[in-house]
Amino acid sequence: MIAISAVSSALLFSLLCEASTVVLLNSTDSSPPTNNFTDIEAALKAQLDSADIPKARRKRYISQNDMIAILDYHNQVRGKVFPPAANMEYMVWDENLAKSAEAWAATCIWDHGPSYLLRFLGQNLSVRTGRYRSILQLVKPWYDEVKDYAFPYPQDCNPRCPMRCFGPMCTHYTQMVWATSNRIGCAIHTCQNMNVWGSVWRRAVYLVCNYAPKGNWIGEAPYKVGVPCSSCPPSYGGSCTDNLCFPGVTSNYLYWFK
């Protein structure tokens, strides 16, 4: 985790509270882990095996409507990035990532975690109090960071790309549009008492979204600039939809809720 000073934390808290939803600075890393996909799965399994989640909560950690809204919003944002992306992959729902998100949300800890998973996964957090009309009220603040972000064009990367952010943070947005982060799983949890930067929030609505593969690698751009779908990985077989490298998913949303 990148630490932020008490002064900047207080300022950030003040700025974000004006929107009724608070987001937390997320981490960046200098290089991808050398471990393969099975290590990610092993880390997820270890977390779920050790998590103390009441059985009543295990039945459903996010509604079908909320899941669809989050997934569709991410793909909409990813397909409309500017400058356009040549290798932006279509994002699909991952049940294991969602279960992992619930295990962390159930702790009601306002911080990223667990730490051993963050080597493999990206994570965006959001919290608010009071009623809300749509789950996207907790998600859109991540995208709103785009107004403060300057994309690093190829000529800016010599060889490492600079991170040009002219606001409190931009890494929630960059994680949303990280081209290779093609899986997402989220959970929402109501915390009766949650400590948010020194203040106790009553009945805080806590959203955790996990992403894989992890994005926000230091020195790298979120995606490759170019004609949409012109640099898709070979595994996609040339399939493209709405400017996204499309995997030809055959299962529908209901599959995840059987």
UniProtKB/Swiss-Prot annotation:
InterPro entries: Allrgn_V5/Tpx1_CS, CAP_dom, CAP_sf, CRISP-related, PI15_CAP. This is Peptidase inhibitor 15. It is found in: Secreted. The keyword Secreted applies. Weakly expressed. Expressed at low level in prostate, mammary gland, salivary gland and thyroid gland. It comes from Homo sapiens (Human). Belongs to the CRISP family. Its main location: secreted. Residues 71-211 form the SCP domain. Residues 20-60 form a propeptide. Keywords: Developmental protein, Glycoprotein, Protease inhibitor, Secreted, Signal. N-glycosylated. Glycans are attached at residues 26, 36, 124. One of its GO terms (cellular component) is extracellular space. It comes from the Eukaryota. Serine protease inhibitor which displays weak inhibitory activity against trypsin. May play a role in facial patterning during embryonic development.
